[in-house]
């Protein structure tokens, strides 16, 4: 029997408000342990939560960007469970009346577009953070306790790990564009749990699902789902039964490990939060929030294609993160040719960032300096090959491209008389290559160009070198 994979994702996103969702404690990453918490976060007797209006607006903004219907009335509920990082023994969340529902985003995998439904988006508070020492005890940091979160629950519309990866990339991009979160997985501001099951192809009944945790990167989400699909497939094909359970992805072995048998919602004994009143979202408030939503990835991608003539693939890559899209737009605004700017960002800049494991904001390169360098290529002052030397200087130390070119003697040689002399010397030194080219071996010309470039230390104007070589060979 053949099976298909059914996947749903639960994504938690921390909202970057200045204070926490129900208290005035600061909401910032990286502070010393237990320095950003107060009696409300810790649930001291007699204290009362006060809802952060900015958190609601950020959640509403994200929900609108994800095409959700915004509830006119919503409420908060207590989710009851005991764990050391949860000092109140309950979490304030939303159960049966979430802020947003019935949304969707469009993904593209292997050239095919597909809509993935979003069941709901709700607000809740984050828990603290446990650090296991390995010495028989654990440390608890309550700085994260009470941080405003949105949980984004997808429909079980995802059919492969590749689709899950594409969904997460698109979701992250949209959230970052709205400005409500930085979505840094390494800091925990975006976290993902995955639910996966198998069912016979053609069936409309869902199989028993497994929840996967400890998925600390999009690649680990993909790896965990790939492994779990194979594990469940082997069990089903051998006549076994899948248990509903929670499993942890092990980064070292690239396998999933049983954590616990899965709880149902009834295990949490939800009931309405008695210390918070019903929240009413009137039309005026909704429209004000909607008006604050900036241009989103799909719209920007379309604009880059229509206004600047970029290929769709280039536009898609450039708009995948807001930081890259903004950098590209600023580079073009400073006079760079859009296609050249796109090529440099997609190849040289992205290659450097990947090799160094850095982000754009970590390097010295600016849109102004990149545009200035590209304009030197456009006006023939330097070649693309020489530009790579200038780029290395800009990306590591910043500076003025024109000044760098002059100080390092990198100006492209475009003097026809000077180049013709070098061309003649190269032709005299390589008579066999000349004969090969005359006999139809085009690669011989490439060799001769390389010899001229070598003689000029890469500073000769390549199109002019080609032209002069062909002219002089014809004379022989």
From Swiss-Prot:
Keywords: ATP-binding, Ligase, Nucleotide-binding, Protein biosynthesis. Its EC number is 6.3.5.-. One of its GO terms (molecular function) is ATP binding. It holds the Pfam family GatB_Yqey. It catalyses: L-glutamyl-tRNA(Gln) + L-glutamine + ATP + H2O = L-glutaminyl-tRNA(Gln) + L-glutamate + ADP + phosphate + H(+); L-aspartyl-tRNA(Asn) + L-glutamine + ATP + H2O = L-asparaginyl-tRNA(Asn) + L-glutamate + ADP + phosphate + 2 H(+). The keyword Nucleotide-binding applies. Transmembrane segments: none annotated. Gene3D superfamilies: 1.10.10.410, GatB domain, N-terminal subdomain. SMART domains: GatB_Yqey. Signal peptide: none annotated. GO terms for biological process: glutaminyl-tRNAGln biosynthesis via transamidation; translation. The keyword Transcription does not apply. Belongs to the GatB/GatE family. GatB subfamily. Allows the formation of correctly charged Asn-tRNA(Asn) or Gln-tRNA(Gln) through the transamidation of misacylated Asp-tRNA(Asn) or Glu-tRNA(Gln) in organisms which lack either or both of asparaginyl-tRNA or glutaminyl-tRNA synthetases. The reaction takes place in the presence of glutamine and ATP through an activated phospho-Asp-tRNA(Asn) or phospho-Glu-tRNA(Gln). NCBIfam families: gatB (TIGR00133), PRK05477.1-1 (NF004011), PRK05477.1-2 (NF004012), PRK05477.1-4 (NF004014). PANTHER family: GLUTAMYL-TRNA GLN AMIDOTRANSFERASE SUBUNIT B MITOCHONDRIAL AND PROKARYOTIC PET112-RELATED, GLUTAMYL-TRNA(GLN) AMIDOTRANSFERASE SUBUNIT B, MITOCHONDRIAL. Heterotrimer of A, B and C subunits. This is Aspartyl/glutamyl-tRNA(Asn/Gln) amidotransferase subunit B. It comes from Geobacillus stearothermophilus.
